[in-house]
């Protein structure tokens, strides 16, 4: 059996930086460590951090009455008001937001201040998108994630529009949705804020999926970028399997397979990728 491992598989820069930040803080700090939401969308990493005493919170209300310590902002970023609320409660802040996401916050804040209506191309319930929304005027912010939503979008003709994207959104889908909005004739500025690593990962996954008999996509179930990888690979290779760890993979399905491709989301640690690759190789 021939195994093709995507070079781009595994931790991206932003995720690696965020995870390393939490581990360093956990090692050096004598006070409680909290992360605002799971630091990344990977259950194994979050569980390991919990063993080291790192607690996950999902709102500033959860900090009330808790021992003072450090709150680490997750890689996906948060709304502007969250920073103020954490400080007001007397907690220290360590910001592990991905620099590419921080750039979107700055852009959205700037264009919102200049009177633009902000369109975020992405999944409305994704924490990164929820965070981005918190840096612009809520009354002048829309989230579009489907063609149907793009078709239904309407705005007064004199309004200027600034379009940004969730960093992990499907690049081809982004272009499609932008085109639909653009056809409405608004004065639009488009800022492609999809991370380069996301584009490269998706392009490589698509190429490999076209060449193999089976494709394995590794990542957390809540990971948006892994879900996008699965969709892209499944479109090119019917035998595509979405797993979190080797335990989720039925190796018997690969018995008559000559070529297997492996890729992984940006929140998947190398040890999990290596374990999958090793088990597939040893089995056949």
Give each language-model segment a name.
Residues 1-284:
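The feature marks the mature, well-folded catalytic cores of soluble enzymes
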